[in-house]
Amino acid sequence: MYWDKGSLYKEMDRIYDVCIGCRLCFNLCPSFPALFDSVDHAGDRKREVAIAEGRVGKAIDRSDYLDLPEGEHASDASIEVEFRGEVTDLTEDERWEVVDLCYQCKLCDPVCPYTPGKDHEFQLDFPKLITRAQAIRTKERGIKFNDRFLANMDFAGKIGSLFGPFINFLNKIKILRIFMEKLLGLHRHRILPKFQTNTFSKWFKTHESNIPDPIDKVVIFGTCFTNAHDVALGKAAVEILEHNGVECIYPKQQCCGAPYLSPGDFKGFEKQARPNVDELSQWVKDGYKIVVTGPPTCSLTLKKEYPDYLEMNEKIQAISENTFDISEYLIYLHKQENLDTNFKNEIGTVNYHVSCHLKAQQMGFKGRDVLKLIQNTKVNLINRCSGMDGGWGMKTEFFEPSMKVAEQCVNDINKRDADIVCSDCSLASHQLKQASDGDVAPSHPILELHKAYGFSQNTGK
């Protein structure tokens, strides 16, 4: 039934109908306003047809009813119910616009009162509905070239590590960006993350570590973004962990596969994920925990998407139960009284942007908690999505709505005075920097912790 389009439409109607009646998620992402507006406009279309057919007179503005004598035009007012938009009134384009505008921030999951795990008969999972719709459409039409390109982050990282400075230079040439927009669907004005030739994996191979009696041992899941674009974050995470007596290893790994889920490429996702499952599960079996040092999307994928979209087994369950976001793991150490909190430097007041995919993991604000360990630190929560979501915000057709979401987040940040801005998500930081023309350039809680310890930028000691 999963792949049956009729079954999909039936479930789509059910979930859309619940959302229309609730509208609690009206301000979370462009998908919900598109749904609500389309249904409301469908009602307007029904009214216009009735007026054209002479079945009713020209509709009175709703506000005018309040000024009429009691009972007058009561029949006109009651007939408005007939012109209320319904899910079944949506056109095919309107139905699928809701799908396309969902960028899987998953903020609706903790907000919605009807999601699985909550005691309600509706059992509504909007993000999974959208993924199912994308998967069925992809199965029918095939995977678009730009979706295939944007999903293969490991390939992009390898090319970038070989020709980083040259590619970074080419990305600034206007005529080439126009060509990339036509060929790859990357918006010409999207500032792309810079590639680094000395990747995190190269650095780790030459990194010397000597912890004779570790308090714990972890596998570093570096993520494709940290490996190719944000090496400083990966290095800082390792140096902090080793400073606190944690043994770190970096075994063979590849992109978690999350970019393949966006267009519903389940085969690509499984092909990408299986080697990680085989490798990581073996280390978990040997007593290692998995610490993710990149965007929270990756820890969310290992924890929740692997169990949901791969055939569940002991290996996947072990990975899910033993995966930590880096800030989450440091708070775990702190609760075990194994985290050094003798910091040399203060960082002041922080505007902390809450990552959507950390919220989706429903584990609290661990990045904020890490920052608050540093003496005299005040943290302001910025609880709004940046609108990036990896490939979605890079695409030509979604760049503008992506930036509109980001601008709202920047406005929230600028309302609060702070010494620095932080986000657990490197991609969100990249987005906010562009949306603010460089005025907002978020750091990462781990980088700020690294500074607070007084570590050298190069050696960590």
Give residue spans per PLM region.
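Generic start-of-chain signal for non-secretory N-termini
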Residues: 1-18, 460-461
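Non-heme iron-sulfur electron-transfer modules
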Residues: 1-2, 27-101, 115-146, 439-451
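Short helix-capping and inter-helix turn/linker motifs at the boundaries of alpha-helical repeat units
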Residues: 5-7, 89-90, 247
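Residue-level marker of regulatory loop/turn positions in helix-turn-helix DNA-binding domains and
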Residues: 11, 91, 218
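Cysteine-centered iron-sulfur cluster-binding motifs in ferredoxin-type domains/subunits
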Residues: 11-32, 94-116, 156-160, 228, ...
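Short regulatory "switch" loops immediately downstream of catalytic or recognition motifs
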Residues: 35-39, 110-116, 305-307, 456
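Iron-sulfur cluster-binding electron-transfer modules in prokaryotic oxidoreductases
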Residues: 120-461
